[in-house]
């Protein structure tokens, strides 16, 4: 992989799920760093087993797993172990990590950067703001200066009305409830 994307609730203007997902990733990295050798090998096995389950995911197709991003099936465990060792050593994912979903204001963008993201994606929800162009410029400014409260304040002041936020509890289907 060249990058990783964490995901909040797209189209909501509500950054809560994005923050929760970023914290989950950070927590799992921290767990990996503190894991005993036995726990670490258990994590390698869990990831490896996830790939092996792919063959049985759909009864509609005859799918044979030949290779994975970590190599062929014979070297799968070694590849997973190598990547998890790298994560353990670096204390972060070995690829850039972007966040998406619910990021609608400069403050949201800065907050995601402060949680350790390398960047953010802003979706079509930006067009629900009063002035999408200025909103985009303000979010870019806050992202670039996420450690400078005065710049974040300045970026926030640039904006007109952002997209209206939706409460996640009111959604019929949530991102975290989709798929397997």
Task: Set out the residue ranges of the language-model regions.
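Conserved anion-binding
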Residues: 1-94
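Active-site mouth loops of central-metabolism enzymes
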Residues: 1, 8, 67, 93-105, ...
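A short, acidic, amphipathic alpha-helical segment used as a generic capping/interface helix at domain edges
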Residues: 82-86, 104-113
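C-terminal helical cap(s) of enzyme catalytic domains, especially alpha/beta-barrels
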Residues: 13-29, 128-151, 163-167
